[in-house]
C-alpha cells in the first residue's frame, strides 16, 4: 500500500540516495544482503512502501539509479549496501554530461531516458497503490539537473496524478563546485516550478554550517552531509512506514503546505541535531524539539526564515509523546512568533506524530516549512545568472547542444516571477483585499 518509487540521478543524487537507503534499511532492520534481521513486527508491517519482497524473503529497494557516467554507480555498487539494489535498476551512460544542463536534458540524457523510463515503469507496475515518486538530484551539475528534470517531465506525462517530490541540492552562496551552476540551476528551477509537486531545498553550505556549529565536526565529509539529508528524508515518509497517532503522507503534505501552485519550494530541518556519539545522554522534551526545529540554524538551506514569513509549516514528530503536548507547543510557537507567520492563513501549521523514533533517539522531529524567505536563494542564483548571461559567457556550450538563447531568457524571467510572487505574499495582509473589494462596487 502507498508505495514510493525512489529515483536518484547524477553523482550528488546517487550519493544522497545511497546514504538514504542505509538509513531506511537500518530503520527496517534489513541487512546489506536484503535479509530481515529486525526485532519488531512494526518494521515489517509496511515495509512495502520502499521495498519489494523478492523470492527467498529478500527485500529489494524500489529504487532507480541513473547517471550519464559509470563512476558513481560503481562506487554505489561497491558500497556497503550495493548488493541490495536490483542489478537491472542501474541505468548509466558512458559519456557524462560534463556539468552541462543541455547535454543532460537534450542530447546525452535524451538518448538514455527511455531505458530509465522502462525501469521506472517496471517499478511502478510492481506497486499496489503508487503514492508517488521521490527524486534526489542536484541542480548545479549536468545529469541531476538536466536529465533529472527531463525525467520528471516524462514521469509527469505518464503519471499525472501521482505526487512528484524532489530533494534538490541548490548551489551554495559561497562555495561553488562548478562555474556554470547558475545556468544549470536556473534552467532546472524553470522545470521544477512547472513539473514537480514539492521540492525540498537543500544546500551544501547550510549542511556544512550544521556540521561545524552544531555537530562540532572539524572536517565534515559529503558522507556527513548526506547523513543529515537522509535523516530528514526518512522523517518525511515515516508516517507511511510506521503506525502513528496522526498520519501524514506526500499528498497531505502537499495539500497542507502549498497555498499557491507555484510556491512549492520548502525548507527542511531536522531535530535533535546531536553529533553521532553524544545521542544517548539526554532525553529531549517536545518543547525543546519544537524550539530547535524552528531555529534558523537547523534549516538545511541557506536562507534565514527570519527574513521572511511562513506561509505554512509542517512538523513530523517521531517517538512516544503526547499529541496534546505537540499541539500545545505548535500553537505556542505560532502565538509567540506570530509576526513570522502570515496572518491570512489561520492555523497554518500541520503536525503529525509517528510512534517509532529513528535509531538511537527517543524522540525526533522533521520540519518542512514553506517560507517566503526562500526567495533569497532564487535571488542569489538569479543575480549570478544575469551577471554571466549579460556577457553571454559559457553560452556556446549550451547552444552547441542545440539550445536556444530564448530558453535562457524564459528561465530567467520565470525565476524572477517566482521571487516576486514570494515577495508579494510576504507583504500581503488580511486587509489588502478588503480595500480592493470596496473599490469593485
UniProtKB/Swiss-Prot annotation:
One GO MF term: structural constituent of cytoskeleton
Annotated residues for binding of GTP: 11, 69, 138, 142-144, 204, 226
Species lineage: Eukaryota, Sar, Alveolata, Apicomplexa, Aconoidasida
Source organism per UniProt: Babesia bovis
PANTHER family: TUBULIN (PTHR11588)
Residues reported in the UniProt entry to bind Mg(2+): 69
Description of how the protein assembles with itself and partners: Dimer of alpha and beta chains. A typical microtubule is a hollow water-filled tube with an outer diameter of 25 nm and an inner diameter of 15 nM. Alpha-beta heterodimers associate head-to-tail to form protofilaments running lengthwise along the microtubule wall with the beta-tubulin subunit facing the microtubule plus end conferring a structural polarity. Microtubules usually have 13 protofilaments but different protofilament numbers can be found in some organisms and specialized cells.
A Pfam entry, by short name: Tubulin_C
Protein name as catalogued: Tubulin beta chain
InterPro entries associated with the record: Beta-tubulin_BS, Beta_tubulin, Tub_FtsZ_C, Tubulin, Tubulin/FtsZ-like_C, Tubulin/FtsZ_2-layer-sand-dom, Tubulin/FtsZ_GTPase_sf, Tubulin_C
Principal subcellular localization: cytoplasm
The keyword Cytoplasm appears for this protein: yes
Amino acid at each position: 500500500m502507498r508505495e514510493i518509487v525512489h529515483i536518484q540521478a547524477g553523482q550528488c543524487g546517487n550519493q544522497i540516495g545511497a546514504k538514504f537507503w542505509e538509513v531506511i534499511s537500518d530503520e527496517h532492520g534489513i541487512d546489506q544482503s536484503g535479509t530481515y534481521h529486525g526485532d519488531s513486527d512494526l518494521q515489517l508491517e509496511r515495509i512495502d512502501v520502499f521495498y519489494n519482497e523478492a523470492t527467498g524473503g529478500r527485500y529489494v529497494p524500489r529504487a532507480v539509479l541513473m547517471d550519464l557516467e559509470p563512476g558513481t554507480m560503481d562506487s554505489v555498487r561497491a558500497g556497503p549496501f550495493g548488493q541490495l539494489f536490483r542489478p537491472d535498476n542501474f541505468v548509466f551512460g558512458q559519456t557524462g554530461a560534463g556539468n552541462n544542463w543541455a547535454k543532460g536534458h537534450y542530447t546525452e540524457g535524451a538518448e538514455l531516458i527511455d531505458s530509465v523510463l522502462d525501469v521506472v515503469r517496471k517499478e511502478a507496475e510492481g506497486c499496489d497503490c503508487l503514492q508517488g515518486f521521490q527524486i534526489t538530484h542536484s541542480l548545479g551539475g549536468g545529469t541531476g539537473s538536466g536529465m533529472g528534470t527531463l525525467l520528471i517531465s516524462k514521469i509527469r506525462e505518464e503519471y499525472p496524478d501521482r505526487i512528484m517530490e524532489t530533494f534538490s541540492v541548490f548551489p551554495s552562496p559561497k562555495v561553488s563546485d562548478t562555474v556554470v551552476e547558475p545556468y544549470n540551476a536556473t534552467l532546472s528551477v524553470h522545470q521544477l516550478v512547472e513539473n514537480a509537486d514539492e521540492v525540498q531545498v537543500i544546500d551544501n553550505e547550510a549542511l556544512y554550517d550544521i556540521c561545524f556549529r552544531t555537530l562540532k565536526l572539524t572536517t565534515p565529509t559529503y558522507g556527513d552531509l548526506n547523513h543529515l539529508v537522509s535523516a530528514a528524508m526518512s522523517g518525511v515518509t515515516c508516517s507511511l512506514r510506521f503506525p502513528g497517532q496522526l498520519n501524514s503522507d506526500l499528498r497531505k503534505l502537499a495539500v497542507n503546505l502549498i497555498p499557491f501552485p507555484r510556491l512549492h519550494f520548502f525548507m527542511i530541518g531536522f531535530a535533535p541535531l546531536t553529533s553521532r556519539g553524544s545521542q544517548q545522554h539526554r532525553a529531549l522534551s517536545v518543547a525543546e524539539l519544537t524550539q530547535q526545529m524552528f531555529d534558523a540554524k537547523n534549516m538545511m538551506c541557506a536562507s534565514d526564515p527570519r527574513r521572511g514569513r511562513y506561509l505554512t509549516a509542517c512538523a513530523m514528530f517521531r517517538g512516544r509523546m503526547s499529541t496534546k503536548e505537540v499541539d500545545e507547543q505548535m500553537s505556542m510557537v505560532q502565538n509567540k512568533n506570530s509576526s513570522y507567520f502570515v496572518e491570512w492563513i489561520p492555523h497554518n501549521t500541520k503536525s503529525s506524530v509517528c510512534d517509532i523514533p529513528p535509531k538511537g533517539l527517543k524522540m525526533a522531529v522533521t520540519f518542512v516549512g514553506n517560507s517566503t524567505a526562500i526567495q533569497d536563494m532564487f535571488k542569489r542564483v538569479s543575480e549570478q545568472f544575469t551577471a554571466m548571461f549579460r556577457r553571454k559567457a559559457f553560452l556556446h556550450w549550451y547552444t552547441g547542444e542545440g539550445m536556444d538563447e530564448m530558453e535562457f531568457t524564459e528561465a530567467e524571467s520565470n525565476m524572477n516571477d517566482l521571487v516576486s510572487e514570494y515577495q508579494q505574499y510576504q507583504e500581503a495582509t488580511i486587509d489588502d483585499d478588503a480595500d480592493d473589494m470596496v473599490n469593485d462596487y
